[in-house]
């Protein structure tokens, strides 16, 4: 039986300076969950590690929805099968509750891609940023790259800048390589393979009234 990654939306950024990571609240599998209701469109599960959370998994399309104890929608998105697992694929949205969007963006096989946006509880845009595939040595990585903006709740621009992807020389990856003598696969540690986001070019910072308070040229 395929395992389900039943969790709150992942928003793991690789940026520096404004680094922030929102980690999953709950991981579990279909085998460990209790089916509380089954409908023509899918099944509702009670997450075993948090009885206050209920997960809906639809079959066609492969939908994922997470509800709190009051049946308020917290997260929704689409999934794609990958062997014995399901991956985030397509649009994913996290909510404050009562339909108020907190974070919205797209995934490609569990990797954030394209434009992502965060919102205040009032519905005003908080920030906008972009993820792009960065290839290094034939391996695609996903990193924040491109324009970046933050806003005050009154709509005034707070930060305006640009990120570029650079190779992090301190990063390490484990890859499988074939031993030419034995033909057996073995693990090898490869250094300096992963990209990270780095501020680039002009960065501008504004007060809530719109006054330019700081400018950098990186």
For each feature predicted by the language model, list its residue ranges.
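Bacterial Sec-dependent N-terminal signal peptides
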Residues: 1-25
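Glycine/tyrosine- and acidic-biased, solvent-exposed loop/turn segments at the edges of beta-strands
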Residues: 19-218
